[in-house]
Amino acid sequence: MERVLIVNADDFGLSKGQNYGIIEACRNGVVTSTTALVNGAAIDHAAQLSRSTPELAVGMHFVLTLGEPLSAMPGLTREGRLGKWIWQQAEEGRLPLEEIAHELACQYRRFVDLFGHEPTHLDSHHHVHMIAPIYPIVAAFAREKGIALRIDRQVAAQSGLDQQAARSSAGFSSEFYGEAVSEELFLQTLDASIARGERSLEVMCHPAFVDQTIMGSAYCYPRLGELDVLTSAALKAAVADRGYRLGTYRDV
């Protein structure tokens, strides 16, 4: 049985080092897809690189926790900036859902302006689209646009979210992350998906070269480790041996 593996690199547009790492992992590794932060400091650079790398599918990384929003969001920003306090506001029932829906539409339009086409799919920075009150907004938007949505099945089940709300891969893994990234860890996520009988799987990753922006991230040097693993010839062979075809969200 053929299985589809989507290896999606998050944070396209975060920095030039991030962008170059994603392109390297696509051209010389197993990365097939990326998602772009349209308010990222290096988003124009990302769009330029994508034009010379048509084999890399590009989706949109919805941002509600970093930088400045594209629209006025007085209900979510502090001194005009977004931040991780969104979870506290969610717990307190103070999410400005109309502002969030409007910002999603603004970021989508910005993506199309930058890349010249619609995104292959939607996900989000720090998985904010899986916050229970935000999820139906993003899922309905994806359905309306006819594009796929990253759905973390485990979080959806725990939160009672509708897993059929939008088109998605059968499985999703965020486990290829942290100080201990390795070929073995990557392949364990595939083996677990096979054991669940899933026909398609997205594996999230963050390959990058380290630059000043990445140095300031809480998740820094492991991005280099991810890049090494994802560009391993042995890994690509092991993926094929498990019956996976490298693909994108266009394949699900």
Swiss-Prot record:
Location(s), subcellular: Cytoplasm
Q: What interactions and quaternary structure are annotated?
A: Homodimer.
SUPFAM superfamilies reported in the protein's UniProt record: Glycoside hydrolase/deacetylase
Question: In what pathway does it function?
Answer: Glycan degradation; chitin degradation
**Annotated family:** Belongs to the YdjC deacetylase family. ChbG subfamily.
Q: Which residues bind Mg(2+)?
A: H61, H125
Name it: Chitooligosaccharide deacetylase
Q: What does this protein do?
A: Involved in the degradation of chitin. ChbG is essential for growth on the acetylated chitooligosaccharides chitobiose and chitotriose but is dispensable for growth on cellobiose and chitosan dimer, the deacetylated form of chitobiose. Deacetylation of chitobiose-6-P and chitotriose-6-P is necessary for both the activation of the chb promoter by the regulatory protein ChbR and the hydrolysis of phosphorylated beta-glucosides by the phospho-beta-glucosidase ChbF.
